[in-house]
Structures are given as C-alpha cells and as structure tokens.
Amino acid sequence: MITTVVGSYPATPREPETLRERISSFIGSYDACRPAIETAVRDQVRAGVDIISDGQVRGDMVGHFAEAMGGMMVKDGVSIIFSRITPPAGSIGSDDLIYAIKILRKLTDDESKGVKGIITGPSTMAHASKIEGFYSPQKRERAIMDMADALRVEAEHLQDAGALMIQIDEPFLSTGMVDMGTARRAVKRISGALDVDVSLHVCGDISGVIGELLTFPVDMLDLEFAGRPSNLEVLAEKWRGDKKLGFGCVDTSTEVVESTDTIKNLIERGADIAGEDNLYIDPDCGMRKLPREAAFSKLRNMVKAASEF
C-alpha cells in the first residue's frame, strides 16, 4: 500500500544560527522556513512515507494563498477579497516543492517516492474569505470560478516543478455551506488542466455529501476515518470503485499515538470496502497542531501498519 500525508507538519521556522545564516539574514537572503521544510521532509522520510509534502510551513492554508493572489489580501489575520481574483505574479509554492524534492533525493534514491503539490481549493478559499469588493457576498459563484482559474495556474506551476501528484484541499465541502455543483465545476477547471493524478481532500462528516463527492473529476478522494469512524458506514453505502481512496487512519486531533494494530484494523475495514489496491494510507488531516514527536510516531506506526498488507 502506498503511504502519504495530507500536508502540514509541526516543523517551525528557525532564526539564523550559523555564521553563514547570520550573514544571509543581514543581507536579506535568509529564509527561516527552509530549515522547517528540511525537518518536515527528513521526518517523513525517516518514518517511511512514500509521497511526502514540504510540510506546509509558511502559515495557514488560506492566508498563504490569499497573500499572493491578485485581488486579495490578509488584514489582521483575515483573508479579504477586494477586487477581481487573478493569478499571482509567480508560483506560490514551487520553490518550496523544489527544495523538498532536493532534500528527498539526498535522503533516498528510491524514484518511486516523491513530493505532492498542495493547493487550497477554490470553494474553501472563497468561503473562508471576507468579500469587500467586486463580488457579491451573497452569491460567491463568480468568485469561486475566478479563484479556480487562478489556482489552476498555480497547480500547473507545481506540476511543472516536479510534483508527483496535486492535492486540492476542500474542507468546506463537508459543511453544507457550499454549492456542490459550483464546487465540482471549479475543481474540474483545475484537474482538467493537469497530467498528474489529482486528489481531493475533504475532512469532516461526509454523510451529507459523499454521493456528490464521488462525482468530482479527480483521481482520488481523501477522507478521514480514524477521528470519524461513522464515515466508514457512509462510504460502504455509496462507494463505486472508480477512484482511489485516500484513507485517513490516524487521528490528527489527538496527541495519543495509535498502535500499529489499531491502525491495521482500521485499514482492514477500509480495504473491505474499497479494496487494498485502491487505498492510499494517510493521516486524517494535517498534523501542524500536534507535537513533533507525536506526529512522527503516528506516521511511523501508520507506515508499519500499511507494510503488513
């Protein structure tokens, strides 16, 4: 079974320590997030994960994109749409992705391992932002589709930078706040432009949306099951077998480290529904809020459990 992560990892930016780093800081070229990316990559590789991330160390999933998009800004921690949304002047995440790949290749020569590119989805970006201009707060469809066009450009940048796959994070899809038809069209704007596999990550209770999620034009649905075991029953009723399933099997909302047997038992239930060959094994969600040791231990046990199939 292939193992992966959802994205974020508890690796914090670091102030310059060495003489070279202090000189770089003095001339304005030191990047405090580079050491955090290296920590995230090293931990994921050490745990044995197949498809890793750069750790998403540069801030929250909405603000990081809003700061770069045309027509958007972040003020007092709030993402704001003030004009028409347009693509950023350059790629938001390609440099970090390339650096993560560089570190990965230093650590292993296994070409089957790679780094995923991650974008926050258009519906989540639009619904998590305050609209102050150009679009109607009551009717966000136009904002969502313009967001999709801008994010498509970023996804293409990530693909060109060497991403093994692209993940679209859409946590808002399980909330009931989103028009699913618009969300589907927006995702298609992105996935239809890519050659690599595309995964759609949706956390939360999927009981009200699983039927529609299964119609989204993506190669994989990534869902949480450790923290929400009821999602297994929902999936069993609707699963059609035409996609891969990102199977969240460690709970990222608690520091408690699941045993290998606990994880393995959950994976077995998922395999009974979707088939072993269709499962990609990963955590429920991002791991940013966990202590680093807990995050690493969860990944290590997850990989060990997956290896027993």
From Swiss-Prot:
A GO molecular-function annotation = 5-methyltetrahydropteroyltriglutamate-homocysteine S-methyltransferase activity
Task: Give the GO biological process terms.
Answer: methionine biosynthetic process; methylation
For this protein, the Enzyme Commission number is 2.1.1.-
Question: How is the activity of this chain controlled?
Answer: Is activated by phosphates.
Q: How does activity depend on pH?
A: Optimum pH is 7.0-8.0.
Q: Cross-referenced InterPro entries, in alphabetical order?
A: Met_Synth_C/arc (IPR002629), MetE_arc (IPR022921), UROD/MetE-like_sf (IPR038071)
Which sequence ranges are marked TM in the entry?
A: none
| Highest taxon listed in the record's lineage | Archaea
Query: How is the activity affected by temperature?
Result: Optimum temperature is 65 degrees Celsius. At this temperature, the enzyme is rapidly inactivated.
Name the cofactor(s) required for activity, per the record: Zn(2+)
Annotated Zn(2+) binding lies at 201, 203, 224, 285
Q: Please state what class of enzyme this protein is.
A: transferase
Kindly state which keywords UniProt assigns to this record, in alphabetical order: Amino-acid biosynthesis, Metal-binding, Methionine biosynthesis, Methyltransferase, Transferase, Zinc
Quote the cofactor binding remark: Binds 1 zinc ion per subunit.
| Keyword Transferase recorded | yes
Q: In which pathway does it act?
A: Amino-acid biosynthesis; L-methionine biosynthesis via de novo pathway
Q: Which Pfam families did the record assign?
A: Meth_synt_2
By sequence similarity, the record places it as follows:
Belongs to the archaeal MetE family.
Under NCBIfam families, the record lists: PRK00957.1
The entry's function note states: Catalyzes the transfer of a methyl group to L-homocysteine resulting in methionine formation. Can use methylcobalamin and methylcobinamide as methyl donors, but methylcobalamin is not considered to be the physiological substrate. It was proposed that, in vivo, a so-far-unidentified enzyme catalyzes methyltransfer from 5-methyltetrahydromethanopterin (5-CH3-H4MPT) to a corrinoid protein, and that the MetE gene product catalyzes the further transfer to L-homocysteine. Is not active with L-cysteine, coenzyme M, coenzyme B, glutathione or dithiothreitol as substrate.
PANTHER family tied to this protein: 5-METHYLTETRAHYDROPTEROYLTRIGLUTAMATE--HOMOCYSTEINE METHYLTRANSFERASE
Q: What is this protein called?
A: Methionine synthase
Give the encoding gene's name.
metE
